[in-house]
């Protein structure tokens, strides 16, 4: 069975590698030290510090595993290889809802780099799926669970 690939820009992959390094070199040793200290308190059956540290260790190890997989199966997307005005991973797109003055700016990223609060949307999201491949001036149909609406692509630029 073929492994899933994770489309991303080179910059996104580098960011994941930094996060992985931080987890391995800083967070993991901190958690191990917390476990060691909590063990020194004695009885582990009623030791909430120990339980919390073990839970954090499981979380950190899960993050490490996820990042290692995403990095190992990264598919680097070169946004320069796509037409300058075409929406793709690594591009920033400004859209305006048809019939309104509402504008939104999205940075199209691979799923590993998605952060809606920073305007970074995954290439797998419904909005990105509707926009990818379109060009400035095109109309895209956005289908969300609540509604369907149209947006016009106002501008497309390489994300800085």
Curated annotation (Swiss-Prot):
Protein family: Belongs to the GreA/GreB family.
Keywords: Coiled coil, DNA-binding, Transcription, Transcription regulation
A GO term, aspect molecular function: RNA polymerase binding
UniProt name for this protein: Transcription elongation factor GreA
Keyword Iron-sulfur recorded: no
InterPro entries: GreA/GreB_C_sf (IPR036953), TF_GreA/GreB_CS (IPR018151), Tscrpt_elong_fac_GreA (IPR006359), Tscrpt_elong_fac_GreA/B (IPR028624), Tscrpt_elong_fac_GreA/B_C (IPR001437), Tscrpt_elong_fac_GreA/B_fam (IPR023459), Tscrpt_elong_fac_GreA/B_N (IPR022691), Tscrpt_elong_fac_GreA/B_N_sf (IPR036805)
Coiled-coil residue spans: 1-71
Keyword Coiled coil: yes
GO aspect biological process, one term: DNA-templated transcription elongation
Function: Necessary for efficient RNA polymerase transcription elongation past template-encoded arresting sites. The arresting sites in DNA have the property of trapping a certain fraction of elongating RNA polymerases that pass through, resulting in locked ternary complexes. Cleavage of the nascent transcript by cleavage factors such as GreA or GreB allows the resumption of elongation from the new 3'terminus. GreA releases sequences of 2 to 3 nucleotides.
Stored PROSITE patterns: GREAB_1, GREAB_2
